[in-house]
Amino acid sequence: MSSNIAVVGDRDTVTGFRLGGVREGYVVETPDEAEETIRNLIRDGFSIIIVTEKIGDELREFIEETTSSSALPMIIEIPDKTGPSERETDPLRDLIKRVIGVEMVK
């Protein structure tokens, strides 16, 4: 493995990150395909996995189970080309609070 960062998402998101220098990018079409890809990345030792918010919403329970017991891997959710989704909570804010134990922004 040449990188500790991978991106999982739609073709446009993955292409954008590859152009930005992220070597490991995986285009997925279904939630099952996304979950299998993320499981493989975790098994391969990736410490940061970037996914689109759509994937995050579809795999919420799996992501929370995966990230609740340790700081790594970090699964970071980003908007796709359609823009940010409306949410009551911010997964990135929750991750920061869990990792450092303090809420940074109120």
From Swiss-Prot:
Keyword Ion transport among record annotations: yes
Locations listed in the record: Cell membrane
KW Lipid biosynthesis (keyword) present: no
GO biological process, one term: proton motive force-driven plasma membrane ATP synthesis
Keywords, alphabetical: ATP synthesis, Cell membrane, Hydrogen ion transport, Ion transport, Membrane, Transport
Recorded superkingdom: Archaea
GO cellular-component term (any): plasma membrane
Membrane topology listed for this record: Peripheral membrane protein
Assembly and binders: Has multiple subunits with at least A(3), B(3), C, D, E, F, H, I and proteolipid K(x).
Function of the protein: Component of the A-type ATP synthase that produces ATP from ADP in the presence of a proton gradient across the membrane.
PANTHER family attached to this UniProt entry: V-TYPE PROTON ATPASE SUBUNIT F (PTHR13861:SF2), VACUOLAR ATP SYNTHASE SUBUNIT F (PTHR13861)
Protein name in the entry: A-type ATP synthase subunit F
Species this protein is from: Methanothermobacter thermautotrophicus (strain ATCC 29096 / DSM 1053 / JCM 10044 / NBRC 100330 / Delta H) (Methanobacterium thermoautotrophicum)
